[in-house]
């Protein structure tokens, strides 16, 4: 489903390169590192393509970007604020400018799957941009986000 959608949308865009599917082991490793179970639609996306080397992050990039954010931003925020504004997100795509498309994880540890957000790193703010991954992908490749 996602692979076909992306292939259709990236026609003529040489910068997007769909990768091979992600292994279940790598998805599990990414979930363990991030500390939250991934929503089924994100797992389905990774099972079809492990990123696109531009917008969509691979499982390994999800880990490395989460690691970087956890290392960089604590110096700017108090512990509680860091937990709320940085650590409660599952980042899975990027705009290339340091901001991430993500799911929000609620205080009870459950993932909010009703929306996809953009996490703006300079302000530590989020804004809803899509209702699901398919809508986000469509908007991104049509230059609507």
What are these regions (language model features)?
Residues 98-101, 115, 138-139:
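Intrinsically disordered, low-complexity segments enriched in small/polar residues
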Residues 52-56, 60, 107-110, 119, ...:
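Generic alpha-helical propensity signal that fires on short helical segments
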Residues 1-101, 144:
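A surface-exposed partner-binding patch
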Residues 102-130:
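Segments surrounding the PLD/"HKD" phosphodiesterase catalytic module and close analogs
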Residues 125-135, 139-142:
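Compact, glycine/acidic-enriched structural inserts
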């Amino acid at each position: 489903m996602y692979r076909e959608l992306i292939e259709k949308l990236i026609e003529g865009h040489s910068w997007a390169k769909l990768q091979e599917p992600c292994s279940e082991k790598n998805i599990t490793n990414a979930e363990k590192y991030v500390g939250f179970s991934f929503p089924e639609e994100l797992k389905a996306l990774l099972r079809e393509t492990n990123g696109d080397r531009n917008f969509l992050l691979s499982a390994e990039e999800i880990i490395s970007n989460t690691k970087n954010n956890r290392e960089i931003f604590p110096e700017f925020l108090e512990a509680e604020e860091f937990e709320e504004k940085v650590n409660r997100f599952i980042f899975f795509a990027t705009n290339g400018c340091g901001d991430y498309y993500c799911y929000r994880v609620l205080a009870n540890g459950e993932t909010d799957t009703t929306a996809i957000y953009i996490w703006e790193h300079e302000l530590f703010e989020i804004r809803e941009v899509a209702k699901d991954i398919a809508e986000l992908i469509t908007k991104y490749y049509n230059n609507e986000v």
